[in-house]
Amino acid sequence: MNISKYSKKKFYEGIGLWRVDDAFADPMFNYLVYGFSPGSFFTSVLANDFLSAVAHSHPSNTITALKALTGWMQDYMPRRAFGSYEAVKEWLDMDETTRREILIMHNLICTPKQETFLEIKGEEYEM
């Protein structure tokens, strides 16, 4: 899926409200936008598999970082994208047009019209 720098900014502004660590935010961005597998730890988190998440967790992962991520997931992430291994697999297998529509519906990225307008307007862009 091709998205503009404005959609990327919008996504990261939302995830930033929860102070989600970049090491957690980047895999979520790539999972949601591009349908990339987020790895064993994040797949377990997305599937609500606590035992597997802990088993696959990196020693530097903290409870504070995990709480921020799960708070953001509850507030922003499309319900279709998490909750079980089946939901994760369906998201990974989903075509990019459908993923884009869902992300727009959840206000995680801009519509193509919004992206074009911001580009023409020369909207400031800082990440």
Predicted regions located by residue number:
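N-terminal soluble segments of membrane proteins
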Residues: 1, 125-127
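N-terminal functional modules and adjacent low-complexity/disordered segments of proteins
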Residues: 6, 23, 36, 112-115, ...
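Extended, charge-biased low-complexity segments
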Residues: 10-14
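Amphipathic alpha-helical interaction modules
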Residues: 16-63
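Amphipathic alpha-helical binding modules
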Residues: 63-124
